[in-house]
């Protein structure tokens, strides 16, 4: 049965397979072999184990019970194993995000876009192929939304810099107003080293709020797994 097929998949073997591919992506990126990087990314995003781990990720995280506009949840093993076969680039068309508003401490509300389970899994899949590049080329002193990094690491770096005998006298705090709301789609497509057609579809998928469909001509949805990669990286 489908449920038995799901239970029979060796997750450790899947993780080893993906980890080795990611290590090869890092090696190719460091050697400047961008064609090789692309082919390895393609291999990862089309692999059974990569697609399996993407389904595992979205069905075990905190949002596993939160559905998108289609109200579909992958709550059974049978649904999960069937989902693996749906994660294909050919013919893929993401659905609009379901927008909800989250109350903030200051009384205002923060919009959050909730993708469907399938779109979340596709994002998780492509993120596996993108993360090795982001971690290789990203700023070593960037800590926000980075793997294995936290605000404690940022604090430690500030302490290291500011405790020196010859230390900076000023600390500049800056904030880009409405950064994710207005970031250029053209810039993202030119600078994010991933499948451009898939990225374009995510950026242009729109969102549904109060039963009405809205287009997305600029900015990235707060809820899109790849937004943390939006810091400058080296394009192909």
Model-found features: residue ranges?
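Catalytic palm subdomain of template-directed nucleic-acid polymerases
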Residues: 177-193
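Charged boundary/loop elements
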Residues: 3-63, 128-144
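Single conserved hydrophobic/aromatic residue that forms the stacking wall/gate
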Residues: 227-236
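Phosphate/adenylate-binding "loop-and-lid" substructures adjacent to NTP/NAD/dNTP-binding pockets
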Residues: 37-109
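Short, conserved non-catalytic motifs in the polymerase core
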Residues: 62-75, 94-121, 137-150, 172-173, ...
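Non-catalytic, well-ordered alpha-helical scaffold segments
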Residues: 19, 23, 35-38, 42, ...
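Reverse-transcriptase-like RNA-dependent polymerase core
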Residues: 55-58, 84-108, 121-130, 156-165, ...
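Active-site-proximal segment of RNA-dependent polymerases
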Residues: 5, 123, 130-182
